[in-house]
A protein has these predicted regions:
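Two-component system phosphorelay core
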Residues: 1-57, 61-110
């Protein structure tokens, strides 16, 4: 699968990412690096440990990485979760975590 095909599968905007990063090799390298990024794992661990502050940081980081890489679905869901966690007064409904998990899995599976 080409990097363009990957972005089509995940519903991302390859041209926008290429414009931001300037070189296809950089896009490819950062997408591959995402496969080993532990931010989503940290988010899940924070949720399991009932650590709202760490969950907020992980969701915010995931949102930023996803936005930079043009993972639009993951950006949208991570952004919604980040805003629900921002007050750091408790966890939102599980649907927010589930939505992030589904989009994360979709990117990883592609």
């Amino acid at each position: 699968m080409t990097i363009c095909e990957f972005y089509t599968v995940i519903g991302g905007n390859y041209d926008e990412v290429l414009g931001r990063l300037q070189h296809e090799e950089l896009v490819r390298r950062f997408v591959k690096r995402f496969l080993t990024d532990r931010t989503h794992e940290n988010l899940v661990a924070a949720r399991n440990n009932n650590d709202v502050a760490s969950a907020f940081r992980a969701a915010h980081t995931l949102k930023g990485v996803a936005a930079t890489l043009g993972f639009d679905g993951l950006t949208t869901t991570a952004s919604a979760l980040t805003e629900k966690l921002r007050p750091q007064t408790g966890f939102p409904d599980d649907e927010y975590f589930s939505a992030v998990g589904r989009e994360y899995d979709r990117v990883i599976a592609a």
